[in-house]
Amino acid sequence: MKFFVDTAEIDAIAELNDLGMVDGVTTNPSLIKKSGRDIIEVTREICAMVDGPVSAEVTATDAETMIAEGRKLVEIAGNIAVKVPLTWDGLKACKVLSDDGHMVNVTLCFSANQALLAAKAGATFISPFIGRLDDINLDGMELIEDIRTIYDNYGFETQILAASIRSVNHILDSARIGADVITAPPAVIKAMVNHPLTDKGLDAFLADIKAADIKIL
């Protein structure tokens, strides 16, 4: 499974990237706005840091302008994936941009029907939003499972990029089901290391070392 980090914070990306935890990055205008910097400037800096795909989102809602924005975004770096919404115009833009040879991440997916359309339109990634489905008492993981089954049935190459990840359990369940990629905030990825028994065991270990006055350096 590939790990994408969902942020525009340069320091957070660098920390995880240094550990080999970053296979890509997802951004959106809201995340970049928090940084207080220019969208092109921030995206270019992220692309220089990370070898994998960096999703940069269009701001338009009509196909023609989405295509124009997408073509401008891919000029930033060769690892840009143009992020478009799962609307009819978004699918039109996806088809054109993918035919041009560019990576496209179709976002805001909430149904298997939508995911099927995105794959047919040539999407590189489909981003089903798990947490937002859970928020309205629907099963986000069931959607991941349905998409996995459909894509496997017909050999679609579109990668399932599980998004709106709220917890480490979302990551684990996505891995069990077979999502190709997850994208999560840095804090959620870092929380994967935590377990109370690890903390308890380390405390006991350190107490034993102190009692025995063991030193290596």
Swiss-Prot record:
Enzyme class: transferase
Catalytic residues, chain numbering: K83 (schiff-base intermediate with substrate)
Alphabetical list of InterPro entries matching this protein: Aldolase_TIM, TAL/FSA, Transaldolase_3B, Transaldolase_3B/F6P_aldolase, Transaldolase_AS, TSA/FSA_arc/bac
E.C. numbers: 2.2.1.2
Cellular localisation: Cytoplasm
Keyword annotations of the record: Cytoplasm, Pentose shunt, Schiff base, Transferase
GO molecular function, one term: transaldolase activity
GO terms (BP aspect): carbohydrate metabolic process; pentose-phosphate shunt
Keyword set includes Cytoplasm: yes
Record keyword Lyase present: no
PROSITE patterns: TRANSALDOLASE_1, TRANSALDOLASE_2
A GO CC annotation given for this chain: cytoplasm
Pathway annotation from the record: Carbohydrate degradation; pentose phosphate pathway; D-glyceraldehyde 3-phosphate and beta-D-fructose 6-phosphate from D-ribose 5-phosphate and D-xylulose 5-phosphate (non-oxidative stage): step 2/3
Reaction catalysis annotation: D-sedoheptulose 7-phosphate + D-glyceraldehyde 3-phosphate = D-erythrose 4-phosphate + beta-D-fructose 6-phosphate
Superkingdom in the source lineage: Bacteria
Family note: Belongs to the transaldolase family. Type 3B subfamily.
Function: Transaldolase is important for the balance of metabolites in the pentose-phosphate pathway.
PANTHER family listed in its UniProt record: FRUCTOSE-6-PHOSPHATE ALDOLASE 1-RELATED (PTHR10683:SF40), TRANSALDOLASE (PTHR10683)
Name of the protein in its database record: Probable transaldolase
Organism in which the protein naturally occurs: Ruegeria pomeroyi (strain ATCC 700808 / DSM 15171 / DSS-3)
Taxon lineage: Bacteria, Pseudomonadati, Pseudomonadota, Alphaproteobacteria, Rhodobacterales
